[in-house]
Amino acid sequence: MTTIDENSLRTPGHSLPGPLYTSAEAYRTDLAAVFDRSWLFVVTEPEIAEPGDYVTIALGRWSVVLIRDDDLTVRAFHNVCRHRGSRLLDPGSGSVGNIVCPYHQWTYDTSGRLLHAESSGAGFDRGPLSLRPVHVRSVSGLVFISLAADPPADFDDFAATVTPYLAPHRLAEAKVATQLDIVENGNWKLVMENNRECTHCGGHPELIRSLFPIYGYQADDISPRLRPAFERYTKAHQEFTATCSELDLPWKPVEELDSRLTGFRIEREPLDLAGESFTVDGKKACTRLLADFPTARLGRLSMHVQPNAWFHGLADHAVTFSVLPIAPDRTLLRTTWLVHKDAVEGRDYDLDRLTTVWRQTNDQDRTFVARAHAGVSDPAYVPGPYLPPEYQVDAFCSWYADRVTEHQQQ
């Protein structure tokens, strides 16, 4: 097993050693220490809106079914028949009345209860043979699972903290406008690290238009060149906080990235240009606002949750991102766009306009991650220092090292 000692193997304030990004041994450790033991974001409730709707999720050796029960409860089960272990549902999504094993037709209802076992005979006890459940929690329409026997107990505190930020967007009542899967040719940690800083955002010409170009700067560090942008930000922030106060929307950052098992950060902040949405002109992409907000000028709600997700909530739509490792050098990034349940494509929103910024940003990040993975695979790679604006990357690596160390000590 690859061993991580944060005080020796990882120089504090520096990136991780190359083998922790590239080796098969480290990848197996990551699955066991992180993905088998954490709370993981996997789907949004609108993806499984109706009874019988399901999504299957692959996580290392595991396959999990997320399904909407007939009583509208969101449930999660291991995708393994209790008869002889066959996979029940194929990868992807769909809708079923019951879950029927394709091998011997054992049949389960949407609560996981075994209804029928072919050739079982009289007296056969179906009771103990329900599908094996997986821990599942929904936070304002965002669905998390944990494969651990005893999931991190701090999830309740996390949920209580972020719910006031998320609830006003009513994501559980939204609908999926579209979903995009891409495979990035890099380790999952590089995908997460890339999202935790914006010093590379000059490589995102579509995204950076709606972001104030003062990321990572303190007021005393603002150069004459950036002074107009800083003054524009100051004015926008004053208007933004006044609006948040009027609408009772929390906005101040809460940051606990590396001090707890369920590390997270959440904040609402203003956007540049029209200040309404992640579009090339900053104007709303959907005329039907989420939750029927009275104004589109609410900036962005940003949330990051260790180890595998980040989210953006706008007044007009929301975007969720789920990171799922496939191999040491391949990672699935699933992006989902949510709009008001009554919004109509072609009338209330244009799909290309809605998705352009993050489709382009994801594609650009895919290139950055591939280059980073190629670099950390090179024998010449030596871990480099994180700069002050990259403190969230450093926090992610510290959180990761703590999880692996805890796993190795048990």
Residue ranges and their predicted role:
Residues 17, 30, 43-44, 125, ...:
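Short, solvent-exposed coil/turn linker segments
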Residues 4-20, 172:
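Short, contiguous pre-domain boundary segments
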Residues 47-168:
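Rieske [2Fe-2S] iron-sulfur-binding domain
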Residues 16, 20-60, 64:
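Non-catalytic accessory segments flanking enzyme active sites
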Residues 36-48, 115-119, 303-307:
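Short Pro/Gly-enriched beta-strand edge/turn motifs at strand-loop
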Residues 68, 73, 79, 142-410:
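C-terminal catalytic domain of Rieske-type non-heme iron oxygenases
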Residues 1-8, 408-410:
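Basic/polar N-terminal segments that are highly enriched at the extreme N-terminus
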